[in-house]
Design a protein with these regions (language model features):
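Catalytic metal-binding acidic patch
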Residues: 27-67
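Conserved nucleotidyltransferase catalytic core and NTase-mimicking acidic/glycine-rich helix/loop elements
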Residues: 112-237
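Short loop/turn segments at secondary-structure transitions that flank enzyme active sites
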Residues: 48-51, 88-91, 134, 159-160
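A basic- and aromatic-enriched beta-loop-alpha substructure that forms the phosphate/nucleotide-
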Residues: 55-131
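Helical scaffold of the NTase/Pol beta-like nucleotidyltransferase catalytic core
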Residues: 1-24
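Conserved NTP-donor binding/palm subdomain of two-metal-ion nucleotidyltransferases/polymerases, i.e.
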Residues: 8, 18, 77, 83, ...
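Acidic, carboxylate-rich catalytic segments that either coordinate divalent cations
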Residues: 231-251
Length: 251
């Protein structure tokens, strides 16, 4: 599959007249809890020729391929990426910390130290809190629930707790988050659920796990109360991001 993904990325570069600066796996495979039939969620950052950024009718700043089978591939222009980094968009931090990398360049190494300086704890907390709340409300209220949905609530909750404790971007791998933030009394329950999730189809239904639901209810309420008290953060300047953009145009 990796060879096919790299072939698709090369086709994108040829067809779109762009250069891919970074291509990674996102989603459950990068989080470390993929099911046997999980999609490959490939995400990439690209740059076009300088002239493309000097047009009155600007080219669209995303490239999206139709989903085919288990392949889901799309990417962002470096221009869009840097603007989102200025807002401390957590997705940017996730892509650049993915443990599964399909393609990279010198831009990635230049980007990472700058990226860390633009991290906002408050923005990260709101992002992961809203993700946890939405998935919990939508998928885990019934008597029977999809096993995989527990991890789409647990991971953002643990990410919030990581940010509250450390003030840094949370790691992609669920195992690293769990080792740091999951309460001891839930370890066996979550380990059993993780084994089930990774060895069952994506649609596997199980009875609701009340001990996990209680933890999620309590955690969501606690995080919301704390993030609402966070002070307004100072807006970062654009200087370093402008320099990165110009450097990307030369690659």
């Amino acid at each position: 599959m990796e060879a096919l993904i790299k072939e698709k990325l090369h086709e994108i570069e040829q067809r779109e007249n762009c250069r891919i600066l970074l291509a990674v796996e996102s989603g459950s495979r990068a989080w470390g809890f993929a099911s046997p039939d999980s999609d490959y969620d490939v995400r990439f950052i690209y740059v076009r020729p300088r002239e493309s950024y000097l047009r009155l009718n600007r080219v669209r700043d995303v490239i999206e391929l139709p989903i085919k089978g288990v392949l889901d591939i799309n990417g962002w222009d470096v221009d869009k990426t840097l603007k989102l980094l200025h807002k401390s968009n957590p997705t940017v931090f996730e892509w650049f910390s993915s443990p599964i990398v399909y393609q990279t360049t010198d831009f990635t190494e230049a980007f990472k130290p700058v990226m860390r300086r633009y991290f906002s704890s408050k923005s990260g907390l709101w992002h992961y809190l809203q993700m946890a709340e939405g998935n919990y409300r939508e998928y885990l209220r019934g008597d029977m629930v999809k096993a995989k949905k527990y991890f789409y609530v647990l991971r953002p909750i643990l990410a919030c707790r990581w940010i509250l404790e450390k003030g840094t971007p949370p790691p992609m791998l669920f195992s690293e988050l769990a080792a740091s933030q999951l309460p001891d009394y839930l370890e066996k329950t979550v380990a059993k659920l993780l084994d089930l999730k990774m060895n069952s189809p994506e649609v596997k239904m199980i009875p609701r796990i009340d001990i996990l639901n209680a933890y999620m209810d309590r955690s969501i309420a606690e995080v919301r109360a704390l993030v609402e008290q966070y002070p307004r953060e100072i807006t970062k300047d654009w200087e370093e991001l402008n320099a990165l953009f110009l450097a990307a145009l030369e690659m």
